[in-house]
UniProtKB/Swiss-Prot annotation:
Keywords: Cytoplasm, Lyase, Schiff base. It comes from Staphylococcus saprophyticus subsp. saprophyticus (strain ATCC 15305 / DSM 20229 / NCIMB 8711 / NCTC 7292 / S-41). The gene is deoC. The active site is at D89, K151, K180. Catalyzes a reversible aldol reaction between acetaldehyde and D-glyceraldehyde 3-phosphate to generate 2-deoxy-D-ribose 5-phosphate. This is Deoxyribose-phosphate aldolase.
Length: 220
């Protein structure tokens, strides 16, 4: 199995420096990861550095709270794609979901999907803040809104991916969407558990450790 092609090699810490971005770019090229997942401020630079490689640039929208307006998320998405992003991971309006304002949640996702103009959209539902019923509803709304993936976590809300959540999400969306597991996937054992549960993409800062069969102490 080519583990690397399942991995979005991730660096989303607010204090990320250019040197650290250079490091994950070089690691992504060396191991041929599916993408690097970075904050929007680094997208243009990373896209230039990765030109000619198979590694995609993935960035985050409305991150990490999901509480910015739909209009803001739309602008962020268009800007990121114009600067070279091929994939965007957006955070849903979590409060609206908990309020039962499902139409607002769906329209928020649809706004980003439309702005992405055919690029891959992954919808972060922040599982650690949701009940199982809410996880199912968020996954259903992502499907109806036309997203490509539903994703477990930002890694910033105190909890990450679990095999149980991944399975619940996959059972909900079926073959229509893929599932990305992120947050706390630190080693090859974690990685395999997520794939067995139905994930087809893994977001992790421990990408190198995973493909080398080592352990990482990273939370994301």
């Amino acid at each position: 199995m080519n583990y690397a092609k399942y991995i979005d090699h991730t660096l989303l810490k607010p204090e990320s420096t250019r040197n650290q971005i250079d490091k994950i770019i070089e690691e992504a090229k060396a191991f041929n990861f599916k993408s690097i997942c970075i904050n929007p401020t680094h997208v243009k630079y990373a896209a230039e550095q990765l030109k000619g490689s198979d590694v995609l640039v993935c960035t985050v929208i409305g991150f990490p709270l999901g509480a910015s307006t739909t209009e803001t998320k739309i602008f962020e998405t268009k800007d990121a794609i114009n600067k070279g992003a091929s994939e965007v991971d957006m955070v849903i309006n979590i409060g609206a979901l908990k309020d039962g304002r499902f139409e607002d949640v769906q329209k928020d996702i649809e706004g980003v999907v439309g702005a992405a103009n055919g690029k891959t959209v992954k919808v972060i539902i922040e599982t650690c803040l949701l009940t199982d019923e809410e996880k199912v509803k968020a996954s259903e709304l992502s499907k109806v809104a036309g997203a490509d993936f539903v994703k477990t976590s930002t890694g910033f809300a105190g909890g990450g991916a679990t095999p149980e959540d991944v399975k619940l999400m996959k059972d909900t969306v079926g073959d229509d969407l893929e599932v990305k597991a992120s947050g706390g996937v630190r080693n090859l054992e974690d990685f395999n558990h997520m794939l067995e549960a139905g994930a087809t993409r893994i977001g992790a800062s421990a990408g190198v450790e995973i493909v080398q069969g080592l352990e990482s102490d990273s939370d994301y």
